[in-house]
């Protein structure tokens, strides 16, 4: 018979049994957050970031459990040339420092044991958007279109097939 006020029940889970753990990482979010916390000057190499991803994932498994696999989800960098509508400069997305860095991280992660790299793609909408803060200023007539700079617009890209890959891995 159980004492009154006791939190234990017959059906309570036994958490002392080691379990296999899968760690799922949203690469895009992780890298943004990682840079804001540990790499503000962006001085770390892709190899160091990949090592940190691996180490952090292992630290979340705990000593009493086993790592089944680290699933790292991200998109292949966009590989198209477009012209900024404000500055008319040609942007070669595949040669941007961010794209090169991401590809290097992917290569280092591929070399790690128990890491599954799940890559989606970026869907090209074919158009540029004005940043919301600038749209607000335009609508309130604080600025005019001619006041926009090349940094006030961005090329619209949407992540595709990542959600499906997560669903398949969870099932």
Residue ranges and their predicted role:
Residues 2-139, 150-155, 162:
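Domain-level signal for Mg2+-assisted phosphodiester chemistry and nucleotide/NA-binding surfaces
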Residues 160-169:
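Active-site glycine-rich loop that binds ribose-phosphate moieties when present
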């Amino acid at each position: 018979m159980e004492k009154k006020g006791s939190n234990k029940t017959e059906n309570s889970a036994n958490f002392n049994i080691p379990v296999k753990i899968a760690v799922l990482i949203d690469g895009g979010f992780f890298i943004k957050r990682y840079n804001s916390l540990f790499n503000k000057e962006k001085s770390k190499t892709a190899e160091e970031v990949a090592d940190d991803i691996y180490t952090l994932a292992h630290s979340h498994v705990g000593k009493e459990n086993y790592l089944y696999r680290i699933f790292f989800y991200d998109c292949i960098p966009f590989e198209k040339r477009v012209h900024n509508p404000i500055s008319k400069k040609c942007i070669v997305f595949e040669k941007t420092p961010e794209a090169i860095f991401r590809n290097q991280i992917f290569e280092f992660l591929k070399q790690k044991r128990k890491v599954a790299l799940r890559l989606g793609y970026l869907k090209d909408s074919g158009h540029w958007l004005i940043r919301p803060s600038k749209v607000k200023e335009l609508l309130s007539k604080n600025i005019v279109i001619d006041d926009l700079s090349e940094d006030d617009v961005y090329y619209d890209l949407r992540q595709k097939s990542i959600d499906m890959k997560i669903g398949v891995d969870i099932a």
